A protein has these predicted regions:
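Conserved class I S-adenosyl-L-methionine
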Residues: 1-49
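Class I SAM-dependent methyltransferase SAM/SAH-binding core
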Residues: 62, 68-114
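Short conserved loop adjoining the S-adenosyl-L-methionine
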Residues: 115-120
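A conserved beta-strand element that flanks and buttresses the S-adenosyl-L-methionine
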Residues: 127
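A short glycine-rich, Lys/Arg-flanked "PGG" loop and its adjoining helix->strand segment in the class I
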Residues: 142-154
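Conserved beta-strand signature within the Rossmann-like core of class I S-adenosyl-L-methionine
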Residues: 154-161
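Short, glycine-/aromatic-enriched active-site segment of Class I SAM-dependent methyltransferases
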Residues: 165-182
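Short alpha-helix
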Residues: 183-199
């Protein structure tokens, strides 16, 4: 993802990020684990979703932030149509130019904290990986959740970092020895539940990336009040 770091990506920067980001053994393991969990989640949604998921291209998903399109193929392989969005224009451009299939509708650059350029309820789901641990102010997380609730008809699949002492210590040591100032936002489970509820969601499921070790969790949020008709 790229909305987090206040960094402007040009095309060479995107190419370099894509090449380097998941090159290490530990990061390849994380990437594989994330995708395994997400496939199980999507499989569960398809079973609950009925006929809509059975018709190829009937379900429309917003990937926000899309980054360079790391999850595009995974989402399209489940039969959904896909729209990619990110703060960085060249990230969106890269995600779209991969042309994973005709069901990859297109993309748009947007700052989710300020609003998405879409009509209410136009998407069935919003998919948001590796965004929320970069949103430090509570009001930013709440604003993004409200915006996701506005454009999603069914719900949201997103990741967040839940407070975990072991992972927090590991991050602290990494900053100490690598002299990096980059920090991530971990929130208590109760705080995440409150913020989700405030935006109109109930939490259906939360899956830890690595239970007891890693702070990242992947949550399935259901929009309260049932699904409405897509405009």
């Amino acid at each position: 993802m790229s909305i987090s770091a206040n960094k402007t990506f040009d095309r060479p920067g995107v190419a370099d990020y894509e090449k380097r980001r998941y090159r290490g053994l530990d990061q390849r393991f994380v990437d594989s684990r994330e995708k395994r969990i997400l496939r199980r989640i999507l499989c569960g949604l398809k079973k609950k979703g009925g006929p809509a998921w059975e018709r190829e291209g009937a379900v429309l998903i917003l990937d926000a932030p899309c980054g360079y399109g790391r999850f595009s193929k995974l989402l399209l392989d489940e039969g959904a149509r896909l729209v990619s969005s990110d703060l960085a224009f060249h990230m969106v451009e890269r995600a779209v130019e991969k042309k994973e299939g005709l069901r990859h509708v297109g993309g748009v650059a947007a700052d989710f904290r300020r609003g998405l350029p879409f009509k209410p309820g136009v998407f069935d789901y919003v998919f948001s990986m590796r965004l929320f641990h970069h949103l430090h102010p509570e009001e930013d997380r709440e604003a993004v959740l409200r915006e996701f609730a506005r454009v999603a008809k069914e719900g949201v699949i997103l990741s967040f970092y839940r407070v975990r002492g072991l992972h927090a210590l590991q991050r602290k040591l990494r900053r100490l020895f690598k002299r990096t100032q980059r920090t991530i936002k971990m929130v208590p489970g109760a705080t995440f539940q409150k913020e989700a509820a405030g935006a109109g969601f109930t939490i259906e499921r939360v899956v830890p990336l690595f239970r007891g070790i890693h702070a990242q969790h992947i949550a399935v949020l259901k929009k309260r009040g049932g699904a409405g008709k897509r405009p």
